[in-house]
């Protein structure tokens, strides 16, 4: 069969498997996930060996340190993947939940019940842990899933998917409930995006070019998981030590992830003292700062920021920085350049914090906290499918509930419409 025919078959079989998934009890799904987690732990040496093939190929291709970090699996990360699956198993099952019930004047009882989306297609790059995270979330929420990982992680993804699929068979569940498209060529993505008859939604996670390609070519509704151009605004009333700790954590703890800080905005009234203070703290940690004209007045050794820097997701120890006139200017800057991921304000002014929360247009908005908390586990969702930068059908970190929709249920006692 051609690539197109094989992908159509994968999608069609996933559609059939989705009906079986939707009928599974919570207990059956939870036991499946627990067995999947154990299988990953037992197969860790094999997964790590396959991952080494991807790392070696990535080094030969000249992948950046950030990309290689995303790609790398060791024993601790495999354990983390298994732990994430176990956490999903412990979460309440949203399927079948009645979210509201009301009585009509004619005594009809009307309600809304949560149901699976059906078949979810996920297209992603670099991180092999997405394979297990996505599988766990989709299966727990009663969906089938079709995965298409990046070519740079093909050996890792195939190893993980094969281990997980084996558990489906042991539980008497159609193996097609979890499929990984094995083709690394772009044609595999193109054909997947044509399967609107079988796939209900596409969730792309990756760089700008991938997101744009999916949006422009998909016949299926898309929930974008775009890059993370995350901002922190240091207000005039900010505590300097708090600000330093938050900024250092947000930028340096793990710079190669989408919730790391990429642009720092500083209120002009504190620039003279705060800019040198934070410049020293960050450069000591080997962060390169690229500042606007005013920032560089107080930190002359900083590089000059260009217009492109305000849009940049560096994913490394580089930070764009600007001095702004105040809260209005900070909000305007964020709403202009943000990728709608995560933004934070550091302030001692309650009124300013509330304005920031109301007026900043991103999926996660924080007060006096590191952007690194923008994560499903950290926010109490369990493992996440990703962080949506699309307002429909979900916005921000997507957990189990976001992989369901609702249908109306109506109870009558013989009513007919007059």
Swiss-Prot record:
Subcellular location: Cytoplasm
Pathway the protein acts in: Amino-acid biosynthesis; L-proline biosynthesis; L-glutamate 5-semialdehyde from L-glutamate: step 2/2
Pfam family, one: Aldedh
Reactions it catalyzes: L-glutamate 5-semialdehyde + phosphate + NADP(+) = L-glutamyl 5-phosphate + NADPH + H(+)
GO BP terms, alphabetized: L-proline biosynthetic process
The enzyme's E.C. designation: 1.2.1.41
Signal peptide: none
Enzyme type, top EC level: oxidoreductase
Keywords: Amino-acid biosynthesis, Cytoplasm, NADP, Oxidoreductase, Proline biosynthesis
Primary location group: cytoplasm
Keyword Amino-acid biosynthesis (UniProt): yes
One Gene Ontology molecular-function label: glutamate-5-semialdehyde dehydrogenase activity
GO annotation, cellular component aspect: cytoplasm
Family (UniProt): Belongs to the gamma-glutamyl phosphate reductase family.
Function per UniProt: Catalyzes the NADPH-dependent reduction of L-glutamate 5-phosphate into L-glutamate 5-semialdehyde and phosphate. The product spontaneously undergoes cyclization to form 1-pyrroline-5-carboxylate.
PANTHER family: DELTA-1-PYRROLINE-5-CARBOXYLATE SYNTHASE (PTHR11063:SF8), GLUTAMATE SEMIALDEHYDE DEHYDROGENASE (PTHR11063)
Protein name: Gamma-glutamyl phosphate reductase
């Amino acid at each position: 069969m051609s690539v197109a025919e094989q992908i159509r078959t994968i999608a069609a079989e996933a559609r059939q498997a989705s009906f079986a998934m939707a009928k599974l009890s919570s207990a059956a799904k939870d036991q499946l996930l627990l067995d999947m987690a154990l299988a990953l732990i037992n197969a860790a040496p094999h997964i790590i060996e396959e991952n080494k093939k991807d790392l070696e190929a990535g080094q030969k291709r000249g992948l950046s340190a950030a990309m290689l970090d995303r790609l790398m699996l060791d024993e601790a990360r495999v354990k983390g993947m298994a732990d994430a699956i176990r956490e999903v198993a412990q979460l309440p099952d949203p399927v079948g939940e009645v979210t509201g019930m009301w009585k009509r004047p004619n005594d009809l009882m009307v309600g809304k019940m949560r149901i699976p989306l059906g078949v979810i297609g996920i297209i992603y790059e670099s991180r092999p842990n997405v394979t297990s995270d996505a599988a766990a979330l989709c299966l727990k929420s009663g969906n089938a899933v079709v995965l298409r990982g990046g070519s740079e992680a093909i050996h890792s993804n195939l190893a993980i998917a094969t281990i997980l699929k084996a558990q489906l068979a042991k539980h008497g569940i159609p193996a097609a409930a979890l499929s990984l498209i094995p083709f690394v060529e772009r044609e595999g993505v193109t054909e997947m995006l044509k399967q609107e008859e079988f796939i209900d939604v596409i969730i792309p996670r990756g760089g700008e070019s991938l997101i744009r390609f999916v949006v422009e070519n998909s016949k299926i509704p898309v929930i974008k998981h775009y890059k993370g151009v995350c901002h922190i605004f240091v207000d005039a009333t900010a505590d300097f030590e708090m600000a330093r700790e938050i900024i250092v954590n947000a930028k340096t703890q793990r710079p190669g992830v989408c919730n790391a800080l990429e642009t720092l905005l500083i209120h002009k009234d504190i620039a003279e003292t705060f800019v040198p203070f934070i410049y020293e703290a960050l450069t000591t940690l080997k962060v390169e700062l690229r500042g606007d004209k005013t920032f560089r007045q107080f930190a002359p050794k900083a590089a000059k920021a260009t217009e492109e820097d305000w849009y940049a997701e560096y994913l490394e120890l580089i930070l764009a920085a600007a001095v702004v006139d105040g809260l209005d200017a900070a909000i305007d800057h964020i709403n202009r350049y943000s990728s709608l991921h995560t933004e934070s304000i550091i302030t001692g002014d309650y009124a300013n914090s509330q304005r920031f929360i109301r007026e900043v247009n991103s999926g996660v908005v924080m007060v006096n906290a590191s952007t690194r908390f923008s994560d499903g586990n950290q926010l109490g969702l369990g493992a996440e499918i990703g962080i949506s930068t699309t307002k429909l059908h979900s916005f921000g970190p997507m957990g189990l509930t976001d992989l369901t929709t609702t249908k109306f249920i109506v109870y009558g006692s013989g009513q007919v419409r007059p």
